């Protein structure tokens, strides 16, 4: 059970090293009501947990609190535009639950698995899922591990946010997808440059129709930038070698 503390500026005591101030968690924007509908209260509770326990446990920087809605929750939920009804998705390197938890709240029809290699983060995710009452599975593991691939292969979509460069991310994502399933990686403003840099490796890993799309243009400034790639064929054995998964 999470206990929400007041989130506000913290002044260091005399003689203490300077600490970065904790920003204020703002109210949910109007667009959140449209995205989350009757589950807005669940999204608000998640925002509170991120702004308190998420900061205390080092999963979110203290200066990110006032940007939780736009930069983190809505940015993640916007990917729902690219998902079909009832899609089975896996969130690779879920960290604090982004983008998987906002997607699960906005789209209860989705089957969501949160994959996270670090114990403290997977424990946090389990607590959050229980607190919010979500039908979401939390798994501690890495995308490149054989047991993970055997159990969670054939997904409709593999989503991620700020996990790794596209060469590694594609190698981890493609084996978890069904034929024509899609990797949806939330990236920054240089996504197109990254695609150009790694396109050859992505193709060798079984990716096709690689493109950069935007989501949430009606309510996000800037909108979410997503690299979309379809699994066209099984990845070449050499391109799926085991490596260390990225962390946030």
UniProtKB/Swiss-Prot annotation:
Q: Please name the Pfam families in this protein's record.
A: GidB
List of residues binding S-adenosyl-L-methionine: 93, 98, 143-144, 161
What are the record's GO terms for cellular component? cytosol
Q: Which UniProt keywords apply?
A: Cytoplasm, Methyltransferase, rRNA processing, S-adenosyl-L-methionine, Transferase
Q: Where is the composition biased (Basic residues)?
A: 230-248
PANTHER family, per database record: S-ADENOSYL-L-METHIONINE-DEPENDENT METHYLTRANSFERASES SUPERFAMILY PROTEIN (PTHR31760:SF0)
By what name is this protein known? Answer: Ribosomal RNA small subunit methyltransferase G
